[in-house]
């Protein structure tokens, strides 16, 4: 990298930062009509490496860039497994990955989707109402698991995965898009065997080339270009302790820090 690139934005990823990460998603300043999505901790002022970065034209807003980055996870996992997605779908968790998965499924044409969440915040209710109108969909919030054919697991929590295994019917599918980090797992392999369950991992890096991931990202940016996304993304200006303050309470699906450059 010949010329130093400043970092203009970083995105908060609660799933990783809860376990000690200081952030890893940065968006560079504009140079020669281009931006880069880079590996970057919060408060880093310059891009250290372009390894695993995505280059894209400066024609997309920050809300689109943020959603599209998280939407890589469901896209790269679900695209070649659509035969395993049944109409009875539940998404467990509505954080960064869960909400991105919801948007991706709606864009694929799935209309009836249940959402399992514990805390039904106003921003969640408002978003579901808006998306139901926009997509003519039937998105519903549930607080307990029942029987579905397709489970999108976006929490990474062992007890949720265990409950899915206990409730799932034969020949159904689970997509593990959340990252299990707890270290204690409660799944009985005999249940998987007896019910002939399909389980798919959803890690966005392993088994996928940089070219494939970059292509997915560009496709998503184009897909989302005309979407109204401002209500789903909070952008905060840089100030002391802003990251810690934002992490204290979740106020929207996506949270972004903007730096003075």
What annotation goes with each model-predicted range?
Residues 185-233, 242:
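C-terminal substrate-binding/catalytic core of Rossmann-like NAD(P)-dependent dehydrogenases/reductases
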Residues 27-92:
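NAD(P)H dinucleotide-binding glycine-rich loop of Rossmann-like/cofactor-binding domains
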Residues 1-44:
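Glycine-rich beta-strand-centered segment in the early N-terminal region that forms part
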Residues 125, 129-198:
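Glycine-rich cofactor phosphate-binding loops and adjacent beta1-alpha1 units
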Residues 42-43, 59-61, 118-121, 178-182, ...:
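Short, acidic/turn-prone active-site loops that include or flank metal/cofactor-
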Residues 90, 94, 116, 152-154, ...:
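Glycine- and other small-residue-rich loops at beta-strand/loop junctions that grip anionic moieties
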Residues 64-145:
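Mid-domain Rossmann-like dinucleotide-binding core that forms the NAD(H)/NADP(H) cofactor-binding site
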Residues 258-261:
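Phosphate-binding loop/pocket of nucleotide- and phosphate-handling active sites
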